[in-house]
A protein has these predicted regions:
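Gly/Ala-rich beta-loop-alpha elbow adjacent to hydrolase catalytic centers
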Residues: 63-67, 71
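Conserved acidic catalytic loop of the alpha/beta-hydrolase fold
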Residues: 41-59
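Conserved HGGG/HGGXW glycine-rich cap/lid loop of the alpha/beta-hydrolase fold
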Residues: 1-41, 50
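Conserved alpha/beta-hydrolase catalytic His-Asp/Glu region
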Residues: 95-99, 113-163
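Conserved donor sugar-nucleotide recognition element shared by glycan-biosynthetic enzymes
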Residues: 40-47, 68, 99, 115
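Active-site acidic short loop of glycosyltransferases
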Residues: 1, 26, 55-58, 79-80
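Flexible "cap/lid" loop of the alpha/beta hydrolase fold
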Residues: 72, 76-120, 126
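Short beta-strand immediately N-terminal to the catalytic nucleophile in serine-hydrolase-like folds
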Residues: 61-63, 88
Length: 163
């Protein structure tokens, strides 16, 4: 069986793909796994396991930001599972030293303060100005998804992204 696998951005969850999943699930198999808090290796194993459970032999992988990092990890582990990829706002190379320092600093702040500050810190760079100005429902959904994340999962993911 063939389908689509949606891979969410940091620090979101599969809820970010609800509209896309709802649109496609009547036409083909769709997965949107949750992996916040896992290393990329563990996340790839989880995705492949969910694909196996669903009987999904191959897929088009859609990765946004951190989801794109995971697409590359999946391709290293199981290239035969790929029909194609859609990558957005991601990169194939490692973080710069400055980016790594910023991730570790953000990790420390999350562990100290929780996730309450993250929407204001991240949404300006995650959503375009037009979306922020004209689509309050999108902004609110993104804010809510971020606030649902556990500080521990966010902190662990920041380490995974830095390494």
């Amino acid at each position: 069986m063939r389908g689509v696998v949606f891979l969410h951005a940091f620090p979101y969850s599969p809820r970010m793909w609800e509209g896309e999943v709802a649109l496609l699930k009547t036409r083909l198999p769709v997965l949107a796994p949750h992996y916040l808090g896992l290393s990329l290796g563990k996340a790839a194993e989880k995705v492949l396991g969910e694909m196996d459970e669903a009987g999904l032999e191959q897929a088009v992988f859609v990765g946004l930001s951190m989801g794109g990092y995971l697409v590359f990890e999946l391709f290293r582990k199981a290239p035969e599972r790929f029909l194609g990829t859609v990558l957005s706002s991601t990169r194939a190379g490692p973080d710069s030293e400055e980016a790594k320092r910023n991730r570790y600093a953000l990790r420390e702040r999350v562990l100290k303060e929780g996730v309450g500050f993250l929407p204001e810190a991240l949404l300006p760079s995650h959503l375009g100005r037009t979306t922020q100005a004209t689509k309050p429902e999108v902004v609110e959904k993104a804010r809510a998804i971020i606030l649902e994340a556990s500080p521990e999962a966010v902190a662990e993911t920041l380490v995974a992204l830095a390494e």
